[in-house]
Amino acid sequence: MTQNRAELNRNLAQMLKGGVIMDVTTPEQAKIAQDAGACAVMALERIPADIRAAGGVSRMSDPAMIKGIQEAVSIPVMAKVRIGHIAEARILQAIDIDYIDESEVLSPADDVYHIDKNQFDVPFVCGAKNLGEALRRIAEGAAMIRTKGEPGTGDVIQAVRHMRTMNKQIRELVALRDDEVYEAAKQLAVPYDLAKYVHDNGRLPVVNFAAGGVATPADAALMMELGAEGVFVGSGIFKSGDPAKRAAAIVKATANWQDADLLAKLSENLGEAMVGINEDEIQTIMAARGE
């Protein structure tokens, strides 16, 4: 990937800022998400809650299923590959996917190395729990970062923890003297130029979304309050009682997160929320995959 292409991919991801990206498993769900105002959809055969419940090895979705969703909507379509699975990423690029998510939700294919995303033209999304993880993924070519959170739980606590951790570490890096950034980069295990960018600009060089456990308009507003530039919603919409209404409410809450009166109205009569899993009840911690 050329420097110009890398810059283009980062700019494409910037266009999603302030939006909501929704997990969908069928063309019908994709249309609901698009009608609700989603800025993109994530096409996958099973949403994270079902992946967690079923157990076993989870892999890239069937390309035919992904193509069906691509044909159903005009907004960008993302799809997931396993961490380190170069061949899955090549397949998704071959079917003209808009974004690839190298995702801890799926079973990792490589427990040491991530995909060299600089070898691809399609932009990549990657998860991170802290600043070091985020900058390492960006060094590998990621055009967009999201918190890992804990997918499929409906519990936002880990997404909150990861966003707070990342932003705290950014503030700490900004506060350093110029000659202290070298040591900080070494401790974070990241390239100096990326650490210097954060030090000088007070933010990541790519867009940073929240993901993992967002299930209500209030959850989305909370993540925006904490510095997210947009929100991924997985199981929280189509595992709820009224997906269309909840999807539209979360989109509006993300765009108007500072308007408490509107948030109160958006939170009314949404139907039953997804049945969640508390952090201390989780058996498999997906966020620990791919550091």
UniProtKB/Swiss-Prot annotation:
**Cited PROSITE patterns:** PDXS_SNZ_1, PDXS_SNZ_2
- Which positions bind D-ribose 5-phosphate? D23, G152, G213, G234, S235
Write out the pathway annotation from the protein's UniProt entry: Cofactor biosynthesis; pyridoxal 5'-phosphate biosynthesis
Which GO biological-process labels does this protein carry?
amino acid metabolic process; pyridoxal phosphate biosynthetic process; pyridoxine biosynthetic process
InterPro entries, alphabetized: Aldolase_TIM, PdxS/SNZ, PdxS/SNZ_N, RibuloseP-bd_barrel
Q: Supply the EC number(s).
A: 4.3.3.6
Matching Pfam families: SOR_SNZ
Give the domain of life: Bacteria
What are the protein's UniProt keywords? Lyase, Pyridoxal phosphate, Schiff base
Q: Where does D-glyceraldehyde 3-phosphate bind?
A: R164
Note the subunit structure: In the presence of PdxT, forms a dodecamer of heterodimers.
According to its UniProt entry, what is the function of this protein? Catalyzes the formation of pyridoxal 5'-phosphate from ribose 5-phosphate (RBP), glyceraldehyde 3-phosphate (G3P) and ammonia. The ammonia is provided by the PdxT subunit. Can also use ribulose 5-phosphate and dihydroxyacetone phosphate as substrates, resulting from enzyme-catalyzed isomerization of RBP and G3P, respectively.
Q: What is this protein called?
A: Pyridoxal 5'-phosphate synthase subunit PdxS
Q: Which organism is it from?
A: Bifidobacterium longum (strain DJO10A)
